[in-house]
Swiss-Prot record:
The lineage of its organism: Bacteria, Pseudomonadati, Pseudomonadota, Alphaproteobacteria, Hyphomicrobiales. It catalyses: (6R)-10-formyltetrahydrofolate + 5-amino-1-(5-phospho-beta-D-ribosyl)imidazole-4-carboxamide = 5-formamido-1-(5-phospho-D-ribosyl)imidazole-4-carboxamide + (6S)-5,6,7,8-tetrahydrofolate; IMP + H2O = 5-formamido-1-(5-phospho-D-ribosyl)imidazole-4-carboxamide. CDD domains: IMPCH (cd01421). It comes from Rhizobium etli (strain CIAT 652). The IMP cyclohydrolase activity resides in the N-terminal region. SMART domains: AICARFT_IMPCHas (SM00798), MGS (SM00851). This is Bifunctional purine biosynthesis protein PurH. InterPro entries: AICAR_Tfase_dup_dom_sf (IPR024051), Cytidine_deaminase-like (IPR016193), MGS-like_dom (IPR011607), MGS-like_dom_sf (IPR036914), PurH-like (IPR002695).
Length: 538
């Protein structure tokens, strides 16, 4: 395969003599233009940026004056011109390039300050199709890419947050920039255009209902670098995609240390789980360890919901993540701070609760600003060696399913409510998952076992331990409903559940041996319903 090859010298210091400024986000642009003007830099600009700089009383030249071609088509065409791109792309030390510049009257551009139409913001706000298309920038990305390619000679700035460092460079080096800085800004520029194009590509896929586009690019903006990843020897960073889904990505850290990689992963799992329970129906609390719930409950008040969730497995809850579906109040905060907790996340926090939590300065307190809607569609992704698995979010809700009673005995109304509660929780438990629940409270949770029978046994064991800790005479699973997130392949799993005291079972169904399981349920007077929906989680 033939490739383009050209060795380009890279001078360390390049003096800024001419700058092109064309931005949508005008944060700091006038101040930057002022700093450049004071150094005698010639300013070129376009449209609204030109007006902002000129209004500030600074000398600035409209790009159309150097191209000899006016802005046309509502500004769609203004910088797509050889005079502009030649000035950005010319190799200053190449005699042929210099001759071409001289012949065509092209002036070299040493600095490009460019940011883009707010496509991502318009998309996130739900703009209609024509408006969203109109906010696809064309000239901006072209200038950014041209400048970044020629970073040996051209400095490209795409982020107002970099203006201060750039001005420091000018002050330190007599109006010049260092190659290392230009190189770093070029890398950042290409990352920006890549993310921008990814957002456009993904929007088209959504708008046209293309489930598996030929190219799938998942972009994100760096929110924070982390001390390490899952383990201290792993490097990590947190990127946000821009999806306006309330949760750990959008939450405000009200107090406490920076969230760790594991904190973020666990907090996301906790908040997505607790959002399954509508706050207008009842307060709810979920306690998470290692992305699995160790206790979930509703209650007549938020503090009662927390106490009931904690009662399921108070040992595992130590050092856990607590998620609430209602505003954290003072009474609940007083209870929570009695136990070592890593993170609390809630839709909001009262001032009284903040004053209580502050007594635990290392406790991370997050205000999410709302609850995520479990029914809203979205994507999830997971890396594998050399690949990326992408799927739609599991937004199936048990309330939306037509439950099928498959046993002789139908569940009572209370059993049915407990079944739905357990199935909601089971959706968020690592497979194989078995969840016992009674009266809006998990009684025992078995997670992540290779055998469903083992998950059922572990859940029952957890319930026995909880009963002992609470001084109860019988396990919490006695008279409970139990959920399996996937079908029961054999009757042995059901028999383990019955032995634990469950009287009602909810599962997807679909096994070759469904009838065998149904017969066993009928033999023991158990009520069982099929949901027709599986909730594997890995």
């Amino acid at each position: 395969m033939a490739v383009i090859s050209k060795k380009i010298p890279a001078p360390d210091k390049v003096e800024i003599k001419t700058a092109l400024l064309s931005v949508f986000d005008k944060t700091g642009i006038v101040e930057l233009a002022q700093a450049l003007s004071e150094r005698g830099v010639r300013l070129l600009s376009t449209g609204g940026t030109y007006k902002a700089i000129a209004t500030a009383g600074l000398a600035v030249t409209d790009v159309s004056d150097i191209t000899g071609f006016p802005e046309i088509m509502d500004g769609r065409v203004k910088t797509l011109h050889p005079t502009v791109h030649g000035g950005l792309l010319a190799i200053r030390d190449d005699s042929e390039h210099q001759e071409a510049m001289k012949k065509h009257g092209i002036e070299g551009i040493d600095l490009a300050v460019i940011n883009l139409y707010p496509f991502e913001e318009v998309r996130a706000a739900g703009g209609d199709y024509p408006t969203t298309v109109e906010n696809i920038d064309i000239g901006g990305p072209a200038m950014i890419r041209a400048s970044a390619k020629n970073h040996a000679y051209v400095t490209i700035l795409t982020d107002p947050n970099d203006y201060a460092e750039f001005k420091e460079q000018l002050s330190a080096d007599a109006g010049k920039t260092a190659y290392a800085f230009r190189q770093r800004m070029a890398a950042k520029a290409y990352a920006r255009t890549a993310a921008y194009d990814a957002a456009i590509s993904n929007w088209f896929a959504e708008a046209l209902s293309i489930d598996a586009p030929r190219h799938r690019v998942i972009g994100g903006v760096l929110k924070e670098e982390m001390r390490y990843g899952e383990n201290p020897h792993q490097k990590a960073a947190f990127y946000v995609t821009g999806e306006k889904r309330p949760g750990v990505s959008t939450a405000v850290l009200l107090q406490g240390k920076q969230l760790s990689y594991n904190n973020i992963n666990d907090t996301d799992a906790a908040y997505e789980l607790v959002a399954e329970f509508l706050p207008e129906k009842a307060p709810a609390c979920a306690i998470i360890k290692h992305a699995n719930p160790c206790g979930v409950a509703t209650g007549s008040s938020l503090v009662e919901a927390y106490r009931r969730a904690l009662a399921c497995d108070s040992v595992s809850a130590f050092g856990g993540i607590i998620a609430l579906n209602q505003i954290l109040d003072a009474e609940t905060a007083e209870e929570i701070v009695k136990l070592f907790t890593e993170v609390i996340i809630a839709p909001d926090v009262t001032e009284e609760a903040k004053a209580i939590v502050v007594r635990k300065p290392n406790l991370r307190l997050l205000s999410a600003g709302g609850l995520p809607d479990p029914r809203v569609a979205g994507l999830t992704a997971k890396t594998v060696s050399g690949g990326l698995l992408v799927q739609s979010r599991d937004n199936g809700m048990v309330e939306d399913l037509e439950l099928k009673v498959v046993t002789k005995r139908a569940p009572t109304s209370q059993e049915l409510e407990d079944m739905k509660f357990a199935f909601k929780v089971g959706k968020h438990v690592k497979s194989n998952a078995v969840v016992y629940a009674k009266d809006g409270q998990t009684a025992g949770i078995g997670a992540g076992q290779m055998s469903r029978v083992d998950s059922a046994r572990i859940a029952a064991l957890k319930a026995e331990e909880a009963a002992k800790a609470l001084g109860l005479a019988v396990p919490m699973t006695k008279g409970s409903a139990v959920a399996s997130e996937a079908f029961l392949p054999f009757a042995d799993g059901l028999l383990s559940m019955i032995a634990a005291g469950a009287t009602a079972v909810i599962q997807p169904g679909g096994s070759m041996r469904d009838q065998e399981v149904i017969d066993a349920a009928n033999e023991h007077g158990i009520a069982m319903v099929f949901t027709g929906m599986r909730h594997f989680r890995h």
